[in-house]
Amino acid sequence: MAPLLFLPILQLLLLYCTKSAQAQLNISIGSSLTPQGINNSWISPTADFAFGFLAVDGNSSSYLLAVWFNKIADKTVIWYAKTSSNRQDDTIPIQVQAGSILKLADGALSLRDPSGNEVWNPRVTDVGYARMLDTGNFRLLGTDGATKWESFGDPSDTILPTQVLPLGTALHSRLLATDYSNGRFQLNVQDDGNLVLYLVAVPSAYYHDPYWASNTVGNGSQLVFNETGRIYFTLTNGSQINITSAGVDSMGDFFHRATLDTDGVFRQYIYPKSKQARSLWQEQWRAVDALPENICQTIQTKVGSGACGFNSYCTFDGTKNTTNCLCPQRYKFFDNERTYKGCRPDFEPQSCDLDETAAMVQYEMTPIDRINWPLSDYEQYSPIDETECRRLCVIDCFCSVAVFNKPSNTCYKKKLPLSNGNMDSSLQATVLLKVPRSTNSPSMISSGSSKWKKDKKYWILGSSLFFGSSVLVNFLLIFVLLFGTYCSITSRKKTQLSQLPSNSGLPSKIFTYRELEKATGGFHEVLGTGASGIVYKGQLQDECGTNIAVKKIEKLQQEAQKEFLVEVQTIGQTFHRNLVRLLGFCNEGTEKLLVYEFMSNGSLNTFLFNDSHPHWSLRVQVALGVSRGLFYLHEECNKQIIHCDMKPQNILLDDNFVAKISDFGLAKLLPVNQTQTNTGIRGTRGYVAPEWFKNIGITSKVDVYSFGVILLELVCCRKNVELEVADEEQTILTYWANDCYRCGRIDLLVASDDEAIFNIKKVERFVAVALWCLQEEPSMRPTMHKVMQMLDGAVQIPTPPDPSSYISSLA
């Protein structure tokens, strides 16, 4: 009887508990969360998922507002709050400190920092309550139960079963596993009905060509991860395209997720959930399918670095379904944690001033196993053998890798930066990497030692004979020297004048070698070096003590000896404010020297590339001056002069920072292999026009191309190629500038330059002109006359075509 009396009481208790549990499903108005303490998250009914504050990488000073798998030890994040940045199609993860608060009040959800400033809200009102569902979806609902906002509708990098991505939504990979910023890859359900995987430039967010697409333009509808674990793309006609094809594991036994990972692969994962599954499976996430199957082979982009960073290569482990980025030997990562930034050589780049013998002594080609950079070729030879292939790369300062294909006897040369690198087991070729030789090579030491022993006895004998006879010979030498000096001084200048084709247009002064040797103090103070020789500072013994710059022409090709004075005559006929003036010359036997006016402010290279930015107005003045100087050389001289080696080192600045072009008119005097290539290339790495690498005629447009590079350097106050920059996408200025221009983010190029930001319209105009100059097709580039007009603002500048293809032409 007594138990019957307790039955009504038991029923009441059960009813109370049921209603109490039901009430916990709803998160009511007035509820709040804080990063620290026990009240830091709202849990789903089964406790599978949680919404709230999660410490970033175990760091108790920084917290994400996120949704995560609550029963998994590492608290795998599946959603995190973001806010829009000022960059196109970019968002920034919300990270807050202790003292912040998330509160559901006044019909809205709001996150405020310790100072009370709102840092995030989902931008909905009239919220009646919230729910953390067992599907992993966090919802805000109205008092009528209608969904106002849900985390499934604002995905991050992951989707879960029952989640649907409609047209116009996207998944963004993280930059790193512990860096929740937008990464280098996107999965877009485009408005046009196409499902596309993109490689995205960082930080400009410029979209490169897709590396995978469903090809369903006009037919696609939505991406579905259904409740059974299948992922498919539905079409408007009701049919489906399977995105993953893995066998579906029980939803009751396993947690499921699909994530666009940091390496650009969209993977479906499972994790043992039930006791039975945990007894059979290791408690960790296991990838059961992936798209694309092998991203190392899939991404082959004309612009950008590929799956990994520049100068690195991608490897794929099919058994673990993982990728890895590695550096070739003698290269190292810019940042060991952020390997996407690529690799750089751990040795000094080869100088283009080395002759063939020096290059062969200092560098060698070493084989590397099955690694290929398929889109970095700039030269091809066939038929050829491997030995010659090696030699041609070693003596070419542009060449970093050679690939020899034995079946076809073909050699391909590649240059930095290397892109789209991957480990290719099917590659039927020998890949050779150029590296410095070891300076203490045993073979070199032993050969040198044996040679010394062999020649030692002959050296002693020869020295004895020489010194024994020197007393007698010295008397004769003194007499001959005095007499010869007298004759030489009286006839030297007459000899030089007799060699001239015509005296008209020559510089006003003809110097003897002795005069210039004395003026330069024995060629003591070096001002600079270039392809044509070394420049020394000197001072004339005139009333004013005029400072001069003396260039000693070196490595003059034999057939050009007679052309020297003709070229001096041509240069002597040039008179322009923006050209360095030739004061005189010396032509004594093999000694060829040019005497120029001295430029007190040195080269543009020194002026531009230092810790402080030169004033914007001075940079504009230099750009306009250089353009006028080139226009004069190309179109106003009696005989057109193509410079062929335009670079900041060949632009000098006078007392008033007026830009003056130097080294013009010397191009055809130099040996065609001066840059150590067999293609007749002249110029300097980073400034060379694409046509130098092709068997086509060279025109004045090669100077226009080089000017485009210089113009970007003037705008940004940095070199075209900088291997030490923090972001890999900024390594090559011409690529980065093109990305920024296409995205409408020119301000990124001059972010730390207040003067340039104030003149952002002119900056944009200069960048547009530069991109016109950088067109791969020479006929597409403007003349220097047109360039002058565009820089001055005298004509409208149409939008330049995207010069993406010039990746194959830059060094």
Swiss-Prot record:
Disulfide bonds: 296-314, 308-325, 327-343, 389-411, 393-399
Catalysis performed (reactions): L-seryl-[protein] + ATP = O-phospho-L-seryl-[protein] + ADP + H(+); L-threonyl-[protein] + ATP = O-phospho-L-threonyl-[protein] + ADP + H(+)
Cytoplasmic-side segments: 486-811
Ranges of residues in domain EGF-like: 292-344
Transmembrane intervals: 465-485
Entries under Gene3D superfamilies matching the protein: 2.90.10.30, Bulb-type lectin domain (2.90.10.10), Phosphorylase Kinase, domain 1 (3.30.200.20), Transferase(Phosphotransferase) domain 1 (1.10.510.10)
Domain Protein kinase: 521-795
Signal peptide extent: 1-23
PAN domain: residues covered: 352-436
SUPFAM superfamilies in alphabetical order: alpha-D-mannose-specific plant lectins, Protein kinase-like (PK-like)
rRNA processing keyword on record: no
Places the protein is found: Membrane
Gene Ontology MF term list: ATP binding; carbohydrate binding; protein kinase activity; protein serine kinase activity; protein serine/threonine kinase activity
Residues in the Extracellular compartment per record: 24-464
Glycan attachment points: 26, 39, 59, 219, 226, 237, 242, 321
Record-linked Pfam families: Pkinase
Membrane topology reported for the UniProt record: Single-pass type I membrane protein
Record's keyword terms, sorted: ATP-binding, Disulfide bond, EGF-like domain, Glycoprotein, Kinase, Lectin, Membrane, Nucleotide-binding, Plant defense, Receptor, Serine/threonine-protein kinase, Signal, Transferase, Transmembrane, Transmembrane helix
Main location as per UniProt: membrane
Keyword DNA-binding in record: no
Gene Ontology CC entries for this record: membrane
Enzyme Commission number(s): 2.7.11.1
Residues that coordinate or bind ATP: 527-535, 551
GO biological process: defense response; response to other organism
Protein purpose: Involved in resistance against the herbivorous insect brown planthopper (N.lugens, BPH). Member of the BPH3 (BPH resistance locus 3) cluster which contains LECRK1, LECRK2 and LECRK3.
Name under which the protein is recorded: G-type lectin S-receptor-like serine/threonine-protein kinase LECRK2
Gene symbol of the encoding locus: LECRK2
